[in-house]
Every structure is written in C-alpha cells, then in structure tokens.
Amino acid sequence: MISAGYCRLMSRYNTWQNASLVTAADGLTNEDRWKNRGAFFQSIAATLNHLYWADALILARLKGNERPEETIKHSLTSPSDWADFKALRLQRNEEVEEWSARLRDADLGGMLVWYPGDGSTRIEKPKALCVMQLFNHQTHHRGQVHAMLTAAGAKPEPTDLQMLEY
C-alpha cells in the first residue's frame, strides 16, 4: 500500500508546507489570524492549532503511546500565542520527520488499535491506513489554511508535491 520512503517524502512535504503557511501568516496581525473566516474551524490560527494537535494524536497512536492530554475542543485555542505556536510547530515537524526516518516498510503492516477520548469503542484499523490519514489530514486542513491566507492577501508557496526540492 505505502512504503517507509513514501512516509519520509510526505514528512518532508509536511515540513515544507507548514513553513510556507507559517511564513505567510507571519505577515498578518494576530487579530487577522484569529478572525472567523467561515471555515470549518473558523480561523487560520484555530485550524493550524487543530492540525498541530491532530499530528500529535495520530503520532501517539502510531508510536503506541497515550493520546495527548488536550481534547479536540482545546486544540482550537491552544497555543494562543503565535510565537509559541511557531516554536511548537517546528518541534512537531521534527518529530514527524524523525519518526519517518526510523520507519521500515515492515513497520507499516498489521493493525493499530486505540480507544477514542471517551473510551467507549475499541477501534482497529490497518496501520498503513492510519499513516495515510496522518498525511491526508495534514493536506486537507492546510488546504483550508492556504485558502484563508490567500483570501486575507497573504501569499503562501505553491502546494504541488513536485515543487518540493530534493
């Protein structure tokens, strides 16, 4: 289905695209970053925060660790400080890249089991599918942020995968 090489490529793409969005958002005021723009998570900042949290959640599952303490609701407002967010985003990018660097093709086989926040239902899915969800989820929400930034007059970089420098 997918390979460790695919994961390393997508991790690099993730880092590049996150840097593009953060750089573009740097040109906005804090008020502009938190402005409700009618998107699913309302604002640029809330959507970026959600993505930061979800990366931690999915990585924790893939590593066999406990879920992050923050809930999805909390993920929309924290971190609230832009400088803090930027530092944390860089760390999370590094975490994703380090995870993928250690990954072997065999690590993508088998099933992943977890319980959602309320602990009510056992979920079991193919591990490769969960890894694909990590990257698909990132792309989905970054597309929303890209659209909001563009509408706000900012200029994020192109998103085409073939534009990623080797």
Where are these regions (language model features)?
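Basic/polar N-terminal segments that are highly enriched at the extreme N-terminus
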Residues: 1-8
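Generic detector of well-ordered alpha-helical segments enriched in charged/polar residues
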Residues: 8, 59, 83-86, 109
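Short, contiguous alpha-helical
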Residues: 8-75, 117-166
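Helix-adjacent hinge/juxtasegments
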Residues: 66-106
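Acidic catalytic patch
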Residues: 102-118
